[in-house]
Amino acid sequence: MDQGQTLARLLDSYATDPRKRAVAAAVGAIAEASIEISELIGQGALAGITGAAHGASNADGDVQKDLDVRAEAAIVAALKNVPYAALASEEAEALLMGDPQAPISIAYDPLDGSSNIDTNMTVGTIFSIIPNEPGVAPFTAPGSCQLAAGFVVYGPQTSFVLTLGDGVDIFTLDRKDHVYRLIREKVKVAGDTAEYAINASNHRHWEQPVRDFVDECLAGADGPRAKNFNMRWIGSLVAEAYRILTRGGVFLYPADSRPGYGDGRLRLLYETHPMAFVMEQAGGAASTGRERVLDLSAAATSTHQRSPLIMGSSDKVNRIVELHLDPSAASRTAPLFGRRGLFRT
């Protein structure tokens, strides 16, 4: 690994044609905005950031925090000189249209996990860059068409995770020089990790295949997986994804039976698509339980379409898919545990 590599240098070497130059400009602009957002978060109440509701709701119906609004403004301002055809943001009901002949469109969540601000927990920014095809409705291509994707983690360090379609690199913000420096190159998701992340309070609402997988993990060394597992749940998508990239495991935000959760809660364009692209580029996998996330396309009328997300180590994602597609797989693997989970319903 080149210890002197920076995000800016990587983008310079990548920008070899007009479309790649637009991608590089977009990633660079988001990186610049993320430095501003990181400083706001770091100042917290000293900068007037309290986690209080702003008084409005975003396009998804979530109550906006004051930092949601400031993060959105920072990103829109940073992208003003980038040649884009359209922007799709969690914080905006409609697309922000640019030059219809521009080579790219950009989808982003300016501040994922903003409900964590007042508890001083990890939040982040997520983005996806796709090619623009003049005459075709923006953001209707499958996720496999993404040119670049990534996310920023505002934690103890501010880290920038990026794929340009050729592996995944992780950069950390050098606060002294205000540049992102490469710390991990061509990251690979570990396969043999005994960790899974899911909000277990929703167990009664899950479909049976999700219950079966969790029951296998809970059974530990005495169960069909013959291994003790730890359950994690941070409630921050970027933090969960970063942990998986650095030490493996699997994250589940499945569909469930609650009203409004039939397609999960995460948004396809600016949450599940970019996360799935990052995971696959790092040798992992991402599925809804039944379909590869990168095979999904958004409807032209649904910028904020939802999708379940199961991502992480390929072996675990594949096992969950197997349980969805072949329910008898649970009883074949371990009849004692297939329907006798540790949670009673």
Swiss-Prot record:
Keyword Metal-binding on entry: yes
Named cofactor requirement(s): Mg(2+)
Any one GO biological process: gluconeogenesis
Residues annotated to bind Mg(2+) 1: E90, D109, L111
Chain positions recorded as substrate binding sites: D112, G113, S114, S115, N199
EC class of the enzyme, as a word: hydrolase
GO molecular function, one term: magnesium ion binding
PROSITE patterns hit by this protein: FBPASE (PS00124)
Localization per Swiss-Prot or TrEMBL: Cytoplasm
Amino-acid positions noted as binding Mg(2+) 2 in the UniProt annotation, renumbered to this chain: D109, D112, E271
Pathway(s) it belongs to: Carbohydrate biosynthesis; Calvin cycle
Keywords of this entry: Calvin cycle, Carbohydrate metabolism, Cytoplasm, Hydrolase, Magnesium, Metal-binding
Family matches, as InterPro entries: FBPase_C_dom (IPR044015), FBPase_class-1 (IPR000146), FBPase_N (IPR033391), FBPtase (IPR028343), Fructose_bisphosphatase_AS (IPR020548)
CC annotations in GO: cytosol
Record's signal peptide: none
Primary location class: cytoplasm
Catalyzed reactions per annotation: beta-D-fructose 1,6-bisphosphate + H2O = beta-D-fructose 6-phosphate + phosphate
Subunit structure: Homotetramer.
Entry similarity comment: Belongs to the FBPase class 1 family.
Family annotation (HAMAP family): FBPase_class1
Name the record gives this protein: Fructose-1,6-bisphosphatase class 1
Species whose genome carries this gene: Rhodopseudomonas palustris (strain BisB5)
Gene: fbp
